[in-house]
Design a protein with these regions (language model features):
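N-terminal "arm"/small-domain region of PLP-dependent enzymes with the aminotransferase-like
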Residues: 1-32
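Conserved coil-to-alpha-helix start sites within the AMP-binding
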Residues: 86-91
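PLP-dependent aminotransferase-class I/II
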Residues: 99-123
Length: 123
């Protein structure tokens, strides 16, 4: 790797319509994580996953992790396995609920959680 060369973790996919949606949200003063665009997104996603499923859009990935942990019943004294190659928002909801994050290292070639180390951690 050359000095100063960046490794991008992901590239954003833009369809070209984003600026119009942003302008619409500002024009209608819906610049908070609610409003007609959020409602439409939730409804579209409910139709996609099936009408028997419910969808809730959240303002941040941290909020989504927190809600998922609550839905799983995670609480005081629990341990939650977390990938070590992550942003702190992956572990903060764990500690907020009184649980302990247990970090597992990643594979060098994929950057995904190492399944061998995961198995060792579970044992």
């Amino acid at each position: 790797m050359k000095n100063g060369e960046r490794i991008l973790l992901c590239l954003a996919h833009m369809s070209g319509k984003e600026m119009g949606f942003i302008k619409e949200a500002f024009d209608q003063n819906w610049v908070v994580p609610l409003g007609p665009n959020v409602n439409a997104f939730e409804q579209d996603l409910e139709r996609f996953v099936g009408q028997d499923k419910k969808v809730v859009a959240l303002s941040a990935g941290t909020a989504a992790v927190h809600l998922a942990l609550l839905a799983c019943g995670v609480g005081q004294g629990d341990e939650v396995i977390v990938q070590s190659f992550t942003f702190c928002a992956s572990s903060h909801p764990v500690t907020y609920l009184g649980a302990t994050p247990v970090f597992v290292d990643s594979e060098a070639d994929t950057w995904n959680m190492d399944p061998v180390l995961l198995e060792q951690t579970i044992r």
